[in-house]
Amino acid sequence: MAEANFHLGLQTMKVPMSLHAENRKRLVTELQSKAAGSIVLIQGGESETLHSTDRERLFRQESYFHWLFGVKEPDCYGAIDINTGKSILFVPKLPESYLVWMGKIHPCEHFKELYSVDEVHYTHQIASKLEKLKPKSLLTLHGLNTDSGNHTREAAFDGISEFTVNNEILFPIITELRVIKTAKEIDVIEYANKISSEAHKEIMTHIRPGMKEYQLESLFQHYVYARGGCRHVCYTCIAASGDNASTLHYGHAGAPNDKTIDDGDMCLFDMGGEYYCYTSDITCSFPANGVFTEQQKGIYEAVLKSNRAVMEACKPDVSWVDMHLLADRIQLEELKKLGILQGDVEEMMKVRLGALFMPHGLGHFLGLDVHDVGGYLGVERKKEDGLKSLRTTRNLKENMVLTIEPGIYFIEAIIRQALNDPTRACFIVQEAVEQYYGFGGVRIEDDIVITETGCRLLTDVPRTVEEIETHMAAGRNANEKVLL
């Protein structure tokens, strides 16, 4: 009998359900010495409607639940017996009306085979089925996501008050396991990177001055879904041109990628497709017309040098804070060479001048969430400018997956503030930096996995100035018609 898997046909990836069985086994191994006799109980994501209407949101599974069970349906629960490793899925018993509006109602056996779990029951049976197992306690998930500031949703069901509940043990253990990826998980993340990389290359091929930013966003979304089965993107697409590229999270509801792209604009496209809930996060920066000006080339190559230096230095036991500082130092050195800054770079580092041009952190964990969990397990957040925006301050470990995304941005209002601060103004060549007002910014974001001796690049897009110009020129020669 063939192994159960998730697969969307055509050229999309088959993901084996053994990925989740391996995750459950890892969790049981960690819990056996700490909570023998207990049962893990976790609640999946719920179906919901939009505001006060009956319009359903497009469902996306809760990440911890997906990590353990890989279930695509909403309103489910999962349990794992720590003593035996037995996996139990609880699915809702659907009303007969579901058959008319939503389709076939499957029996429990269907879900047992689909997700390769040991048992499947209905959610209204949770209390009775768990009571028969006589658990020492139920381990529920409760903890803080340090990226969002939100807590995980703790499982609840009718009858839970009859059980001893422990909500302290599970969160730090399962979160740390999510930080260190298995080979099967890395394969899916690499697939998401592959299809997203191709979509970014498609954008470089088809972009033309005069188009709207959202048209390129649309092209990306179409490509990753049509070619790769990525129904979801991992975050709101950033399709920024010109000065919009200096807004770190451009593309939101108040600025919905709606500018007309001008000839001469520098573009910054930060987009990632999501496959089977596993994410990618790639940023490409390039000139709208396919040819870098000297000004654009100087800033771009400064960021690329920073990106590649960090990539070369990443390996187990290296501090992520040190990687951020390395990126800062290189970019300050390059800005000095371009005549935008002056003075001693080490003195610039002391006043955190790098945060003026790169106010965000160097990168973040990547996995089932684009800003993946575990960044501040057992470590403290830094307080200095720039460093306080890091999403982790941990040392690197083998099989961590992270983004490397240095950037240089010319945010006029922030630069003008710095020019009024004597401790920073002394390093800024005012007449030079003013030539970059309206430039926007450059970010180069790649996804990597830490290996035994270094790191492996998962992203595959043109990166040097020559590669980008060659790729964009070839696209123009092969496709003279503008894609609308």
Regions found by a protein language model. Give the residues of each.
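Active-site neighborhoods and metal-handling regions in enzymes and metal-associated proteins
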Residues: 1-484
